[in-house]
Amino acid sequence: MGKPDDLSDGPTTVGEMPLATSAIARPKKPFLLEQVAGPGAPRAFTLELDETVFGRSLQANISIESGGISRKHAVVRRAGPEFSVTDLNSANGIYLNGVKTHSAILREGDTLQMGDVVFVFHEGA
């Protein structure tokens, strides 16, 4: 049998690998819509798909039970680093920062309203 390892001499180096000292990789925060008002609030929805449909229908990616929301109310699309929202010809439309719109780019802190449901957009970091 061999002699037991003597660990008192310090650590054994098996191989060396340079470490990056300029930046430490951190996981990215997800892009999300935080629901701040309406049925089910407060809660948050992570935007992971290239297209996320919001609506009352169970076929919507994010289904919200509210009389002010159409079956397929709006879609949030990702194009590279940008997100946009487009109304899908809903009965009540969409409002970005209190202004009715058909389509718009989403920015950090924007409020998006669909019927009686209000979201705040948060960019990943």
Which residue stretches match the model-derived regions?
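Short, Lys/Arg- and Gly-enriched loop/turn segments at beta-strand edges
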Residues: 119-125
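Forkhead-associated
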Residues: 41-118
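Intrinsically disordered, low-complexity acidic Ser/Thr-rich regulatory segments
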Residues: 1-65
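Solvent-exposed strand-loop boundary residues in beta-sheet-rich modules
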Residues: 37-39, 80, 125
